[in-house]
Amino acid sequence: MGYDDGAGDFTFAASLDKAVEIGMMTRASADCILQKQYALYRRDLVDLSVSALTTPLADGSATLAESLAKKGVFTWEEGRAQGLIGGGQESYVHSSLRNTGAPKPEQSASSGAVSRVTKTYALPSGSVSADVITVDTSAPGVSVRAAMVNQKLGASAPFSSIVSASGADVIVNANFFAAYSGQDKFPVGHVMADGTFLYGVSGLTSFGFTGSGAVYVGRPAVFFYIRGGRNSWACYEMNSKTQGSDLSVVYTPAFGGSVPIKIDGTATTVAGGVITDVRAVAAGETVAIPANGYVMVFGSDFTSTTWYREPSVGTSVTLTPGLTDSDTSGFPMEEITAMVSGGPRLVENGAICTTLEPGFQEARFTSAVTSRTALGKLADGKLVIVSTGSASIQQLRELMLQLGCVEAVNLDGGGSTALAYQGKLIRSPGRELTTTLQIFTH
């Protein structure tokens, strides 16, 4: 990939720049390789290739070696034998500056950490055939990640493409989204990936996962707090298209390059952690979203409250998610690294839950029999993933309870129902997907 000497085709640094450009590694990974100053033999092709092969791809989904093994360039066994997969991996993974819980040893998952059972279950309301995957999320080497296509709201991709690019042992569809023709494909409920919220609208049951493997279930009432100097501002939602005179919403690059303004109010722009612009806006305007920042949109009634303080240009600020004072979910927001949401809730505190949240009272959530996906939590903390080609919500409730779940929620289903296990498509959806939950054991 290049040499440092004068006779080389191009420099070592230039070759790393090219690797970043084509998505072989992140900029941070390339800089890390340079800073480590490996004792390479003239930094030649073989040595650099080993470093590159064991470095995660730009999207963080897998290492280059794992991706190549997935595509059949060489086998997993050959990769492990050469130290390219498993214990030989260098960790150059970007993470947000937050406490993600006690780290787990980086090693291959023990046998039994992930298991799959396919069978027909006899239930009070009728038999259901399902794939049931149980995951010991606290086992060494196991990690749970939520993923959104291109980390952008509204982006979608065929499930087969998501599976091919991931390298995860288990992939399942997650949040409901506006899926039909002409709709924006935005998700429903919270979505957090790699410790960063991509979408935040409270009200639905969410599954949250920490870096140490703990699983939390509840309806976290999340605010997004921007703090600077002696002042602070609370945004009720993140990247929501809903705007109101009494609301406050924060927009990040996951929303897009700009945000259309629908109400009269104030827009505050933050770039690089510093407030760069504060101005009055009116419905019909558009405000650019910085690639390294975000925009806060406050409605006119919100800014008229006695406790609102006008932001000042030049103020250094931080953005952190937190729970409202009235929240009872108990989510440790400083430790959560992944979150997906769904509805209706199926099991709560070890008992069947028949309450239907707003938006989940149509026939497809009550009497209809269709393909479904569900997440559950066992009493010992393990995660249960269920995928079935035919079940009613009541049957799904009964199944999750029979499996021993103390908490469970229904995820998107119907034409979105998707499951991949160890690289094989077990259940293919009838449409492109936006958000998935992925389990890694290496």
Model-derived segments and their meaning:
Residues 98-442:
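Gly/Ser/Thr/Pro-rich low-complexity, intrinsically disordered segments
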